[in-house]
């Protein structure tokens, strides 16, 4: 009897997860990829992998159906539903077919922990997904079908569905049905055929994936409540900030107007994300309008935040009235960051994106990561110069607030680097997305971190009756730009009139000094005589 060794993983799983790991390695801010719960297939073709032809149909974390689920209301039950799945093969593939011929196309659903049950080999040889003639002769499987073994945890899984081309049929249909989910896990769907004669086969239709609480994928479901919490947090911050703003509106600085704008953008972003997730949960499809505005408000907020932190680090509005020649460079950097981030976020969030990130996304991630790094370097370089000048002029109040600001940024950068290291560890040890229930923490953390930094900045620069002491004052003692230009100005020739005036002034000062000295010496002599 032949010994059938289980395959550790199907080839497409290894390939795409490797791409996902590279994506997280290159991404400094990180986010998990997103799947829509309604997966549509529109003329998609199969890819050869080993001795099989494969199409990835979806991958989502699903929770088990709740006991006594209310099927009428659609709440409590968890399933994968196949709707109007049709396969069409090209006419040339049936030229040599006989009326008695039959060819299978199979859909296989398995939980990620059961991946070793897919595929096998005879006598420990090369693993294959489709049954080989040698295995068929030994009775281990049926030639032309996918090799799989029942799961040790759930004998009814993997679930395998089949559609058959009979004779010269050009179209076949996969029966519409629901696959109930009775065990919590990360489920994968693959469409597979083994006969090379079906080369050029295309698929049409859709599958619907549902959790007990709605259509949100399992690893995204906690984010809906998270964005609701963040919306409340921004409201609380907004109440504090706007109350201070109204009380001391006569003392408000331009910088504080910018912070007001960022807080308002944050409120809008969190509210739109919450409603986007709520709509997604109800319908299984992302609402394009809400998603677009959520992404745009978020991108504008991040761009404005970067620019504000940069110009504050340069001392704008506090120790210098303008940015001078740097204005155009700051605007150009901000505009480039906005464009790169907006494209990346729209690609990640608009529509159905596979759990396994494509290579094309790397080209969108790299510019954003490089721009982030450039912002950080420029910010800390500018802060160092500003702190040195404040310390040299002994501007204690401004120096104190800038030191606190620098410390807050430094802590944020250190925590960010630490979290990136954790992301790398998390993804490298979760190649098959087995820890999907905790994946939502990664994007949530970045939101919490940015909100925390915003709270610190709001506390440091909150409007108050003393706000004007942090404003730029044109008294000559703080004009950094003017001081920098002094060393570049060459003294001009002095006229004879000016020279005489200067000499006279120096003589007068010397006379006063001598009189004072004489008087002082006289007092000393008088004291001695007494």
Question: What residues fall within each predicted segment?
Answer:
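Generic detector of multi-pass transmembrane helix bundles and their immediately adjacent loops
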Residues: 286-530
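Structural signal for hydrophobic/aromatic residues that build the beta-strand cores
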Residues: 187-191, 242, 313, 383
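Soluble extramembrane domains flanking the early transmembrane region of eukaryotic membrane proteins
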Residues: 2-6, 18-220
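Extended, basic/acidic-rich, low-complexity regulatory helices/tails in eukaryotic proteins
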Residues: 11-17
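Hydrophobic alpha-helical transmembrane segments corresponding to the first two to three helices
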Residues: 208-332, 338-339
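Residue-level marker of positions within ordered structural domains that often coincide
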Residues: 112, 194, 247, 318, ...
